[in-house]
């Protein structure tokens, strides 16, 4: 970024911001040497939020994030109702947004803990938790950004990322509700016998 003029910096920033939420393309190699920790945290936040509803990208979706921000704003203002663009948002929608966000956050943290606590690296290289978390969020959001960690994982580590990609694409709430319904149905079937 240092060798770019102001217009190129602005254009590149816009490109990277949009790309972090959708495609994962980059116009410069992502490494911790070229991006500050603050920059990585910003990219991770954008990746975690992800694409808009109806898009093919993963993440929690922009509509979920907007619902959470509106609920936060209403809470801070002491308002009972959550209103977005003159429309009342139901408590059910807010609870769903909270469920998606918390479930997704816990899932990504579980992925990162599995990668950091198990010996999943083929080479005995040391990676920071920030690098591991970046890779897990990128997989969950199906963005495709990589800082060099993925190629150094063994098959178990790569499997964790693959599962993360499926969960991120399908949605944590959909998978948890399907699992819950299957468990609940089998419990009811056993009680009927």
PLM regions with names:
Residues 1-193:
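Membrane-proximal intracellular helices of multi-pass ion channels
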């Amino acid at each position: 970024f240092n060798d770019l003029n102001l217009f190129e910096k602005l254009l590149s920033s816009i490109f990277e911001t949009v790309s972090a939420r959708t495609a994962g393309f980059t116009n410069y190699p992502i490494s911790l040497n070229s991006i500050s920790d603050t920059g990585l945290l910003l990219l991770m936040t954008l990746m975690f939020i992800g694409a808009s509803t109806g898009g093919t990208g993963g993440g929690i979706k922009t509509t979920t994030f907007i619902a959470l921000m509106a609920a936060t704003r209403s809470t801070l203002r002491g308002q009972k109702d959550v209103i977005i663009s003159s429309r009342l948002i139901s408590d059910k929608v807010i609870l769903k947004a909270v469920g998606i966000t918390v479930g997704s956050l816990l899932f990504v943290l579980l992925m990162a803990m599995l990668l950091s606590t198990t010996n999943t690296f083929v080479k005995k290289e040391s990676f920071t938790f920030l690098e591991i978390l970046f890779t897990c969020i990128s997989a969950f959001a199906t963005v495709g950004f990589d800082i060099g960690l993925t190629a150094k994982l063994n098959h178990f580590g790569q499997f964790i990322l693959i599962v993360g990609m499926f969960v991120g694409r399908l949605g944590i709430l959909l998978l948890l509700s399907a699992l819950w319904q299957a468990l609940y149905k089998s419990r009811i079937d056993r009680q009927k016998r």
